[in-house]
Curated annotation (Swiss-Prot):
GO terms for biological process: ribosomal small subunit biogenesis; translation. Part of the 30S ribosomal subunit. Contacts protein S5. The interaction surface between S4 and S5 is involved in control of translational fidelity. The gene is rpsD. SUPFAM superfamilies: Alpha-L RNA-binding motif (SSF55174). PANTHER family: 30S 40S RIBOSOMAL PROTEIN, SMALL RIBOSOMAL SUBUNIT PROTEIN US4M. InterPro entries: Ribosomal_uS4, Ribosomal_uS4_bac-type, Ribosomal_uS4_CS, Ribosomal_uS4_N, S4_RNA-bd, S4_RNA-bd_sf. Pfam families: Ribosomal_S4, S4. This is Small ribosomal subunit protein uS4. Residues 95-157 form the S4 RNA-binding domain. One of its GO terms (cellular component) is small ribosomal subunit. The keyword Ion transport does not apply. CDD domains: S4.
Length: 208
C-alpha cells in the first residue's frame, strides 16, 4: 500500500465510514474499525459542537476531493440559490464534471476522474474541457475524445465499476456510445452523501 493509500485509509478510519466508496477501504475499516491512535475499546474523547461540524465539513471536502477554498466558494454559491442551503451545496458538488464522470462509472475514483478531465479526454457539449470543477446543468452532454485507446480505457472502467455503485437517476449514461447526459439537478434524496450537510452549513455560517 503506497503513502497516498495509507493516508486515505487513515481518513476512513477517522470518519468511521468509507467516503471513497471503494472496496479496499471497507476492508481497512473491517480490520481496523477504530480511529488512528485508538486501540480496542479505548474511550473516545468528547467532541465539541464545533468539532462535530468540522468533521462533517472534512467528510464532504475529502469525499469530493475539493480544496478548502473551493468548498468555501461552493457554500457561498449555495447560499445564493433558493431552497435549503445544505441541499444546494451537495447538488452543486454532485454536478462537478469530475464527479459526474465518476458517478457514470467512466473513472474508478474521483481522483481518477479529475485526471481524465485534466488530460483533455472529455468533450462537453462539443468542446474539449480540462477543468474538473466545471458545474454542469440540465441537458449538458459529455462525450469521450475520439481515440480508440481512450474509449477502451473508459469501457474497462465501466466494467470494473458496474457492480460497485448504482447509477444516479439524474444522469443518463449510454455505455455503448460513451455518452453522459445530465437530466436534471439532483435533489437531496438522489445524493448518497455520507455527511451531515446541515452541520457544514452551521460551520460556515458561524464564520461568515
Amino acid at each position: 500500500m503506497n503513502r497516498k493509500q495509507i493516508a486515505k485509509g487513515k481518513l476512513v478510519r477517522r470518519f468511521g465510514i468509507n467516503i471513497f466508496e471503494q472496496p479496499k477501504y471497507d476492508k481497512i475499516l473491517k480490520k481496523k474499525p477504530h480511529p488512528p491512535g485508538m486501540h480496542g475499546k479505548a474511550r473516545k474523547a468528547k467532541i465539541t459542537e464545533y468539532g462535530k461540524q468540522l468533521i462533517e465539513k472534512q467528510k464532504i471536502k475529502f469525499t469530493y476531493g475539493v480544496s478548502e477554498r473551493q468548498l468555501t466558494n461552493t457554500f457561498k454559491e449555495a447560499k445564493k440559490h433558493h431552497g435549503v442551503t445544505g441541499d444546494n451545496l451537495l447538488s452543486i458538488l454532485e454536478r462537478r464534471i469530475d464527479n459526474i464522470v465518476y458517478r457514470a462509472g467512466f473513472a474508478i475514483s474521483r481522483a481518477h476522474a479529475r485526471q481524465i478531465v485534466s488530460h483533455g479526454i472529455i468533450i462537453l457539449n462539443g468542446r474539449r474541457v480540462t477543468i474538473p470543477s466545471i458545474i454542469l446543468r440540465a441537458n449538458d452532454q459529455i462525450q469521450i475524445k475520439e481515440k480508440d485507446s481512450l474509449k477502451k480505457l473508459i469501457r474497462s472502467n465501466i466494467e470494473k465499476t458496474s457492480s460497485l455503485r448504482n447509477l444516479p437517476t439524474w444522469i443518463e449514461v449510454n455505455a455503448d456510445d460513451l455518452n453522459i447526459k445530465v437530466k436534471h439537478a439532483p435533489s437531496r434524496d438522489e445524493i448518497p452523501t455520507l455527511a451531515n450537510e446541515q452541520m457544514v452549513v452551521e460551520y460556515y455560517s458561524k464564520r461568515a
